[in-house]
C-alpha cells in the first residue's frame, strides 16, 4: 500500500458542540492577534511575543481555565496553547480578554502538526500535557499520545534542562507514561527513577481534580527533564 494514503493514528477525537455567543465574540475579536496558524510555518518566538522569555507549550488545554491561571500567575513567561476543539479556543480567548492576558498565543490545530512544522528545536523551557485522553480500552492504547516516538519529538523542542510535565487521573495511563518516559533516551526523571512527582505550583488544581480528590481519586504527575 502507498504510504501516502495511510492515515495517521490520532490521539484525539473531534467532539461536537458549538461556541457560545460570548466565546464567538471573543474569537472574532482576538483570534487575528492571538491566533497562530500551522501553514505559516516555523515560529520566531521573540517576534511572536515581542520579547525573549521563558516559553511554555501546553498541549490540549481543554476550556483553557488552567492555562489562563498559569499565564496570570507567571507574567514573565510566554505560553503557547494548542487545542483542536473550537469552543475551548473561544473560552480561552474570552478568559484572556477578561483578564487582559497578553502572554498567550493559540494554535487551533493538531499538536503533532504544530510540533513538527512550527516549533524551533531547543526553543521550549517547558512542555505540559495535562489529562490527555487515556484511551481506556486496550485495543485503543496505541492512540495514547505518550509514545516513545512522540517523546523524542518533544525532547527535540525542549532546551537542554527543559521539562516535560505530564499529569493524568487514570492510573494505568500513569504507569504507561512512566514506562515510556523511563525508556526515552535523553530524558531524566526529576523525582528519581520510577518516581511520580508531587504536583508543582505551576500546575493549578482544576475543579474536576478537586472533585476527584473528594471521591478518593488519584492524580499522577510526571516530570522529566532533557539531558544532553
From Swiss-Prot:
Binding positions for substrate per the UniProt entry: 137, 169, 206-209
CDD domains: AdoMet_MTases (cd02440)
Entry coiled-coil feature ranges: none
Disulfide cross-links: none
UniProt KW keywords: Methyltransferase, S-adenosyl-L-methionine, Transferase, tRNA processing
Chain positions recorded as S-adenosyl-L-methionine binding sites: 58, 83, 110, 133
Pathway where it operates: tRNA modification; N(7)-methylguanine-tRNA biosynthesis
InterPro entries registered for this protein in UniProt: SAM-dependent_MTases_sf, tRNA_(Gua-N-7)_MeTrfase_Trmb, tRNA_methyltr_TrmB_bact
Pfam families in alphabetical order: Methyltransf_4
EC number(s) per entry: 2.1.1.33
Catalytic activity, as annotated: guanosine(46) in tRNA + S-adenosyl-L-methionine = N(7)-methylguanosine(46) in tRNA + S-adenosyl-L-homocysteine
Entry similarity comment: Belongs to the class I-like SAM-binding methyltransferase superfamily. TrmB family.
Protein name: tRNA (guanine-N(7)-)-methyltransferase
Gene that encodes the chain: trmB
Amino acid at each position: 500500500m502507498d504510504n501516502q494514503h495511510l492515515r495517521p493514528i490520532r490521539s484525539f477525537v473531534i467532539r461536537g458542540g458549538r461556541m457560545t455567543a460570548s466565546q464567538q465574540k471573543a474569537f472574532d475579536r482576538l483570534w487575528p492577534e492571538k491566533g497562530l496558524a500551522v501553514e505559516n510555518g516555523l515560529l520566531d518566538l521573540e517576534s511572536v511575543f515581542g520579547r525573549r522569555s521563558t516559553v511554555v507549550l501546553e498541549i490540549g488545554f481543554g476550556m483553557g481555565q488552567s492555562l489562563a491561571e498559569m499565564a496570570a500567575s507567571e507574567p514573565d513567561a510566554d505560553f503557547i496553547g494548542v487545542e483542536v476543539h473550537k469552543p475551548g479556543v473561544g473560552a480561552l480567548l474570552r478568559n484572556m480578554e477578561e483578564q487582559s492576558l497578553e502572554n498567550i498565543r493559540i494554535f487551533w490545530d493538531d499538536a503533532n502538526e504544530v510540533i513538527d512544522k512550527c516549533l524551533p528545536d531547543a526553543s521550549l523551557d517547558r512542555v505540559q500535557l495535562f489529562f490527555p485522553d487515556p484511551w481506556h480500552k486496550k485495543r485503543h492504547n496505541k492512540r495514547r499520545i505518550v509514545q516513545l516516538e512522540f517523546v523524542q519529538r518533544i525532547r527535540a523542542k525542549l532546551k537542554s534542562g527543559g521539562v516535560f510535565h505530564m499529569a493524568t487521573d487514570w492510573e494505568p495511563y500513569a504507569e504507561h507514561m512512566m514506562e515510556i518516559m523511563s525508556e526515552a533516551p535523553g530524558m531524566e526523571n526529576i523525582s528519581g527513577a520510577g518516581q511520580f512527582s508531587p504536583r508543582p505550583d505551576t500546575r493549578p488544581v482544576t475543579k474536576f481534580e478537586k472533585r476527584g480528590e473528594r471521591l478518593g481519586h488519584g492524580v499522577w504527575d510526571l516530570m522529566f527533564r532533557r539531558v544532553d
